[in-house]
Amino acid sequence: MKTTVAVLGPGAVGGTFAVQFLNADDRTICVAPPATVQLMAFSGISLETNGSPPHVGRPEVTEHLSFPVELLLVSVRPDQLQDAIERVDPAAVAEGVVLPLLNGLEHMGPLRERFPGRVAAGALSRFDAYRVGRMQIVRKTPMALVTMGSDELPREELERAGRILERAGI
């Protein structure tokens, strides 16, 4: 059975990770506003890594996540967080890990309120990517390092999330 992963905010970080999850054969769903969903459904996500030819990934796309996922990666802009998390039904992560990869700690309050007991603290390093188009990403680093921890989630759940990331080369 495939692991189901959702990416909330498929920009440079989220889009890169979505393609990596697809390459690891995970069921990958990107959650985004209507215009982005339409564009992704049409073009997919183009990812160029270290000057290699672009690879196009075609994740599932939706405006609202309502079915269960094992991992929800949150990578939206801070000013879009509140609207973005409304796109995810809390029941969808009732048995999953919510992993924000955002700067600062201000986002933890709204995430914990929306998804009580499901949020890990996450940090991303050794990663450099940027968008050259709406769904075109250039990645300059060969790998990414994600560190996560939680006082609320059981160790086994964090380890399961870690294995999902490792399989995707993260």
PLM features: residue spans?
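NAD(P)+-binding Rossmann beta1-loop-alpha1 motif at the extreme N-terminus of oxidoreductases
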Residues: 1-53
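Active-site-adjacent beta-strand anchor residues
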Residues: 7, 30-31, 74-75, 100-101, ...
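Nucleotide donor/acceptor-binding cores
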Residues: 3-4, 70, 118, 144
